[in-house]
């Protein structure tokens, strides 16, 4: 007939178990085996007591001695067992209290993260508003600069108009002077005309006088001439006089006509010049009036722009003051957040110390159980009791604790999850950029890789390469086309052919030769130039969290195993600010009473090693791993940091060997 422990062992062989559950089941099986052996031992003791009772009638003295010894051992054992039970109860209560406090701390951490996210969003909103106001200020500055330029242009036009007005006024003065000269010449011409008329009248009078004188002379001659020739002579004289008169009248008419034409032409020219000068003066006056009106409007606009500029400057000063106040407030909030994070880390360190105390208590109980096992083995050998087959198998098995085991993603997916065990994973990213182009985004499923030009200049990507390294696998390399250029501030996405994207250069490129960029726990994507110089890098590391609960014995204890492989070039993980180191313990050898050296204890290996049945003590080495999963980002939580604890378990007997023969010294 199988015991309950053997049934549970048989059932557990058909279900894949996690290492932590296996360890707990093994510990439970050990305790069950010890209880079975204790029951056998108690039965044997009872049979011996019955035999001793029958023998007590014959040997009273021996019975008294044996009864006293058995009574003392039994009372001591019951006392120690009661103390152990009380210790276990107190440990369970303390553990429940610690779990409640841990859940409360987690809630507080979530609230702090939410408050921090809200404050960061408010800060981003304020920064965006500041950028908008700066853009508005820049536009107003540009408008002011444009207005000032227009003002300078208008002032130049005003100066040019003033110079033109001065020229027109000078031309008007010249025209007036010419008009006065023309009027003077007209008066002079009229005077000359009057003089010529008077001369003509004088010449007429002289001519008439000469005619009369000539007539008298002819009359005198006619008297002397013959009567026959008198009539002919008079006719000839009349013709000559008539011809002379006609010639004089023609000359006088021509002279009058020429003088009138000259006078009329000069007078017409003077009138046209005066009219032209008058029109120019009117136009100049109109232009001067329009220029004055325009100058007044521009002066009003300039004063208005100056008022707007003063208002903008005042508003800018107010915005700068508000931004300074907001920045100081944000700094205070960040300082409060850092202080709260420091307090939280201190509380977590305190909780970790208390948890370490609980671990120490648990290890002490394990040592007592081991001593109890040794005591039972010694009693079984002394009483020649045969241990059960399960006990022999468990005594031949070595329980080794694992530290920092690297569990691959594919193996974790293939492993079936047990009841009460949940698992979650997330990616941690690390990026580095030394050039103009950065690795903006990497798809964890291997669909695409996105690059961004962070500078204000275009960058040629001809013959550049993207190198993808997944764990220890062979890297894959994508080479850009020779003439590809990435514009300033733009992005380019290189899609795998299996993603279903369309080729649309220069923003979207499809790698037809590769169906996927690949996936894994550690993904490193690097951008190389044509000379194989690395200018940008982004690394993704998967973080796996396993939560395991044991519902069979109503134990709510959680074990978190974090597989967090995060590689930095030239950086040691021991400098992680989120790492918590447990306190060291000094182990004393039960044989010689001296403290053990760490190097000797470490050389004995990691795990729980059971000695032979005849040894007086055994060595226990237990490795626990704690490390902050927050990394350098300031997050909280427990992660990997191997801490080894060594204990020496004795059976309560005094050592019979010399210190120089100690196995651990």
UniProtKB/Swiss-Prot annotation:
Subcellular location, record wording: Nucleus lamina; Nucleus envelope; Nucleus, Nucleoplasm; Nucleus matrix
Stretch list, region Linker 2: 215-238
Lipidation (S-farnesyl cysteine): 662
Region (Tail): 384-664
Modified residues (Phosphoserine): 18, 388
InterPro entries reported for this sequence: IF_conserved, IF_rod_dom, Lamin_tail_dom, Lamin_tail_dom_sf
Region annotation (Coil 2) ranges: 239-383
Motif window: Nuclear localization signal: 413-418
Region Linker 1, residue ranges: 67-76
Location of the IF rod domain: 27-383
Main location: nucleus
Region (Disordered) residue spans: 381-441, 550-581, 602-641
Region (Head): 1-29
Segments of skewed composition (Polar residues): 427-436
Modification N-acetylmethionine occurs at: 1
One Pfam family, short name: LTD
The keyword Nucleus is annotated on this UniProt entry: yes
Organism domain of life: Eukaryota
Family that this chain belongs to: Belongs to the intermediate filament family.
Assembly behavior: Homodimer. Lamin dimers then assemble into dimeric head-to-tail polymers. Ultimately, two head-to-tail polymers assemble laterally into a protofilament with a uniformly shaped rod of 3.5 nm in diameter.
The protein's role, per its UniProt record: Lamins are intermediate filament proteins that assemble into a filamentous meshwork, and which constitute the major components of the nuclear lamina, a fibrous layer on the nucleoplasmic side of the inner nuclear membrane. Lamins provide a framework for the nuclear envelope, bridging the nuclear envelope and chromatin, thereby playing an important role in nuclear assembly, chromatin organization, nuclear membrane and telomere dynamics.
Protein name in UniProt: Lamin-A
Taxonomic lineage from the root: Eukaryota, Metazoa, Chordata, Craniata, Vertebrata
């Amino acid at each position: 007939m199988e015991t309950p422990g053997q049934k549970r062992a048989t059932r557990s062989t058909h279900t894949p178990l996690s290492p932590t559950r296996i360890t707990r089941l093994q510990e439970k099986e050990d305790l069950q085996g010890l209880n079975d052996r204790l029951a056998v031992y108690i039965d044997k003791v009872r049979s011996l007591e019955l035999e001793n009772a029958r023998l007590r009638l014959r040997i009273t003295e021996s019975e008294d001695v044996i009864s006293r010894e058995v009574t003392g051992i039994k009372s001591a054992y019951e006392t120690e067992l009661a103390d152990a039970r009380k210790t276990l109860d107190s440990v369970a209560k303390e553990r429940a209290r610690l779990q409640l406090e841990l859940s409360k701390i987690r809630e507080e951490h979530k609230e702090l993260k939410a408050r921090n996210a809200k404050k960061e969003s408010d800060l981003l909103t304020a920064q965006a508003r500041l950028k908008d106001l700066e853009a508005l200020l820049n536009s107003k500055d540009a408008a002011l600069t444009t207005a000032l330029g227009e003002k300078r242009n208008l002032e130049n036009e005003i100066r040019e108009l003033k110079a033109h007005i001065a020229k027109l006024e000078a031309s008007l003065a010249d025209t007036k002077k010419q008009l006065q000269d023309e009027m003077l010449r007209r008066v002079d011409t009229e005077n000359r005309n009057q003089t010529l008329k008077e001369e003509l009248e004088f010449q007429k009078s002289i001519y008439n006088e000469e005619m009369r004188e000539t007539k008298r002379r002819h009359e005198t001659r006619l008297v002397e001439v013959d009567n026959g020739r008198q009539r002919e002579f008079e006719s000839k004289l009349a013709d000559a006089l008539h011809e002379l008169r006609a010639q004089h009248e023609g000359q006088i008419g021509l002279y009058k006509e020429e003088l009138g034409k000259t006078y009329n032409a000069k007078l017409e020219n003077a009138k046209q010049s005066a009219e032209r000068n008058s029109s120019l003066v009117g136009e100049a006056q109109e232009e001067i009036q329009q220029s004055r009106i325009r100058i007044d409007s521009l002066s009003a606009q300039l004063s208005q722009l100056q008022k707007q500029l003063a208002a903008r400057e005042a508003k800018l000063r107010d915005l700068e003051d508000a931004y300074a106040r907001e920045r100081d407030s944000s700094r205070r909030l960040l300082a409060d957040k850092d202080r709260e994070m420091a307090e939280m880390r201190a509380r977590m360190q305190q909780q970790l110390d208390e948890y370490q105390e609980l671990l120490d208590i648990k290890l002490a109980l394990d040592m007592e159980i081991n001593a109890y096992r040794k005591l039972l083995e010694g009693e079984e050998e002394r009483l020649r009791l045969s241990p059960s087959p399960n006990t022999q198998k468990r005594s031949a098995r070595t329980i080794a604790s694992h530290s920092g085991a690297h569990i691959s993603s594919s193996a974790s997916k293939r492993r079936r999850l047990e009841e009460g065990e949940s698992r979650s994973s997330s990616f941690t990213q690390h990026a580095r950029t030394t050039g103009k182009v950065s690795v903006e985004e990497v798809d964890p499923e291997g669909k695409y890789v996105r690059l961004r030009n962070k500078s204000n200049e275009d960058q040629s990507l001809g013959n550049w390469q993207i190198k993808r390294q997944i764990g220890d696998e062979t890297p894959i390399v994508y080479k850009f086309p020779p003439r590809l250029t990435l514009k300033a501030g733009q992005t380019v996405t290189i899609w795998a052919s299996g993603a279903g994207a369309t080729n649309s250069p220069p923003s979207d490129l499809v790698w037809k030769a590769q169906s996927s960029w690949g996936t894994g726990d550690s993904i490193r994507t690097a951008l190389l130039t044509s000379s194989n110089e690395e200018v940008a890098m982004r690394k993704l590391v998967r973080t796996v969290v396993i939560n395991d609960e044991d519902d069979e014995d109503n134990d709510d204890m959680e074990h978190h195993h974090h597989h967090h492989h995060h590689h930095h070039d030239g950086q040691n993980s021991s400098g992680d600010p989120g790492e918590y180191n447990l306190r060291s313990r000094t182990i004393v050898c039960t044989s010689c009473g001296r403290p053990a050296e760490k190097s000797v204890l470490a050389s004995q290996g990691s795990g729980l090693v059971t000695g032979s049945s005849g040894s007086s003590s055994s060595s226990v080495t237990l490795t626990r791993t704690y490390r902050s999963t927050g990394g350098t980002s300031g997050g909280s939580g427990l992660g990997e940091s191997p801490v080894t604890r060594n204990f020496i378990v004795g059976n309560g007997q005094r050592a019979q060997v010399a210190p120089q023969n100690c196995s651990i010294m």
